[in-house]
Design a protein with these regions (language model features):
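S-adenosyl-L-methionine
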Residues: 1-143
């Protein structure tokens, strides 16, 4: 069974970082680079992402867009204080995807696992801080 996203379990408890102007700027850069790439490739979002994840597609505008993704990931990692984390961007197989379509331009599987572990730990720390401040009433412990 694959991973699932449910807002109540994922988004509402996600340990977010504080808003940073640099992330806003990179988000705008990503939006513009993606729009420009869609215009140059004459494709919509879905087909653009197929090109991004295809290592045979090496047009300059795709390389630029991939670099914006790398920059965004690096800045988010830094915002969490994880300067030590090696993201290892490249074309990697993603085991959760269908066998005939597993390659994505993304961070390595090891980096992905490490990020999930760090986010889990951070979520627990923040929750404990909230418990200590009395924000959750009586907390039940799991047996």
């Amino acid at each position: 069974m694959g991973q699932r996203y449910t807002p109540s379990d994922c988004f509402e408890t996600f340990p977010l970082i504080k808003e940073l102007p640099v992330l806003d700027a990179i988000g705008k850069e990503l939006h513009l680079a993606r729009w420009n790439a869609m215009q140059k490739a004459d494709v919509g979002v879905t087909n653009l992402y197929k090109k991004i994840h295809d290592k045979k597609q090496d047009e300059e505008f795709l390389q630029k867009l991939r670099q914006v993704f790398v920059s965004l990931d690096q800045h988010v990692s830094k915002a969490y204080g994880w300067e030590d984390l090696k993201l290892d961007h490249g074309f990697h197989e993603v085991s959760e995807l269908p066998e005939n379509d597993r390659v994505r331009f993304t961070i390595s599987e090891g980096a992905s696992r490490e990020i999930l572990q760090r986010l889990n730990n951070l979520n627990r720390e923040r929750y404990q801080e909230e418990v200590d401040r009395g924000l959750h009433g009586t907390v039940k412990t799991k047996k």
